[in-house]
């Protein structure tokens, strides 16, 4: 069991280090696994079996806020998430805010996921001279070719601050959703900050130090397993009747 937990931790750390420069990435955590003993009549057997955790746990603390000055860079100030439509998958939550406008006007993030509005519909922004995004996520533009000073609301970035009892997990596709695979309803409770990009919440120094510690523990555990095997084989030899 311990060796399996260490293996899973190493996999998560490799994933975290690979994504340390991805805006809004949430650090993967290793799930705690439980142990179940076999029930027998009037007692318990000493043999135990590992029970796998649900998987997909992640750290929710915010990453570093970088004031980029780019008009399509947005970040969530504290708690909350944007809504996205991944290229291959169901609606999900994200903290990634490096936005760009496609030729057809669709607003996407740096991963190519479509940004959704408060109705969970794709946001399409017409050509503009300037753009301003409010704390509520409202997208105000000066239309290209419009009258001087004319502004229109081109859309609203859908956001949510989930209730305390909502459990979020990363799915097999790496996207954040509720444990049942759905997403909470938009409530526009998050604070949106324009000209700012949130980095990942991965601490590379911490990950590397933990990786070294895990590797040492793995080697110790492996030596213990080999020693136990040798002792078992030695005991079997001693108990073998003479020929």
Regions found by a protein language model. Name each.
Residues 1-243:
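Amphipathic alpha-helical polymerization modules
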């Amino acid at each position: 069991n311990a060796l399996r937990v260490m293996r899973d931790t190493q996999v998560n750390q490799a994933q975290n280090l690979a994504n340390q420069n991805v805006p809004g990435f949430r650090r993967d955590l290793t799930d705690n696994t439980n142990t179940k003993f076999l029930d027998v009549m009037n007692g318990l057997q000493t043999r135990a079996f590992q029970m796998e955790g649900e998987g997909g746990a992640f750290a929710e603390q915010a990453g570093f806020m970088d004031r980029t000055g780019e008009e399509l860079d947005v970040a969530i100030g504290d708690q909350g998430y944007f809504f996205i439509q991944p290229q291959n998958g169901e609606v999900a939550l994200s903290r990634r805010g490096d936005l760009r406008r496609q030729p057809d006007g669709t607003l996407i993030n740096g991963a190519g996921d479509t940004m959704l509005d408060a109705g969970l519909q794709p946001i399409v922004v017409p050509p503009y001279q300037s753009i301003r995004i409010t704390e509520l996520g409202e997208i105000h533009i000066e239309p290209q070719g419009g009258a001087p000073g004319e502004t229109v609301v081109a859309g609203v970035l859908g956001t949510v601050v989930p209730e305390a009892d909502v459990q979020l997990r990363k799915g097999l596709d790496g996207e954040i959703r509720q444990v049942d695979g759905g997403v909470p309803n938009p409530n526009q409770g998050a604070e949106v900050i324009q000209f700012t990009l949130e980095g990942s919440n991965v601490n590379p120094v911490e990950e590397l130090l933990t990786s070294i510690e895990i590797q040492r523990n793995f080697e110790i555990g492996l030596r213990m397993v080999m020693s136990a095997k040798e002792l078992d084989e030695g005991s079997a030899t001693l108990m073998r009747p003479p020929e």
